[in-house]
């Protein structure tokens, strides 16, 4: 065998070896004291024929029994928000310490509510342009809902081919907010495309499902929460006939009533109506954590620890709304829920009851439209003998739950959300 041929064979082996171990184990994170008490892997999966799209992920093994525990793929909303927010704010094993930024790396602390105590979780930055995900070349096609479903499915297939020990684990897809448009069709795509994946179901928090319906339900929600008067609500019902989004241009009375309504709620924090509508750069603001995460993710030592490719992106932003051109080509995901129900997949749909962006009334409405019988009627679910929310189960293996006092995402009530998840994923009653 010639030296040239031997060299080429060696090169091929090295390339294949590199691709087979594209993830990197992270044992230390800037801001966290000592070695991480869990196993974290970060890396990229190339998507497309030339792998021009590089999707970044964080993978955390279950702290209980990773060989047998469920595998969960977690998607954040937006579209365009990094899954790092889910990891550090909602359901991960570490969180940013809430303290005033002093110029150094923001501190990380261990959490007690991590979903990784009972599941392996892949936190995926998607679509391309979110978090640390990027494209090596300009995209030919505009990013879209249906396009992302296919990209994420390709990601999952390639990720599992490099982590084959997780093929047999019960598999779930989860997310919140805008991922309500992506997760149901993704479940359908996985179900029809790859029977090797042990797909069991999906989990959605405050899911955007039908934007027009959700906006219309904000008005009865506002009335129920004493944000508008009985008189205004009844007038809006009568004159606008329940349609507050696509109003007839000749219905001037309805337009006036909507203006009166907007005066009542324009300074409201719709993501959690009990919290102030405040500047996130102020340490007094609950969402000051969004300022801290921006400092943390843009720190050079953090990027090095996470093995982020140098020069791949500029400034990390929590939600990259400005730079992602997006085609919202799925107008409603209700039909996908119906198909997933027919196919027998389990689902947990939960709502923070103080979220006005996706009011629980809207979620209940589309669940009713599936027309499945109730198997376990409306009742409180409890933690330490206290009401944590309310729940109802249906014959299509769907469980609906509210989280009392929570807002648009799990970060508002992480402990309660974690307990709810633990019970559901273990097939126990909430």
From Swiss-Prot:
Glycosylated residues, chain numbering: 102, 299, 323, 371
Bilayer-crossing regions: none
Reactions that this protein is recorded to catalyse: 2 1-O-(trans-sinapoyl)-beta-D-glucose = 1,2-di-O-sinapoyl beta-D-glucose + D-glucose
Record has Transcription as a keyword: no
InterPro entries for this protein: AB_hydrolase_fold, Peptidase_S10
Active site as annotated: 177, 355, 408
Family to which this protein belongs: Belongs to the peptidase S10 family.
Protein name: Serine carboxypeptidase-like 13
Organism: Arabidopsis thaliana (Mouse-ear cress)
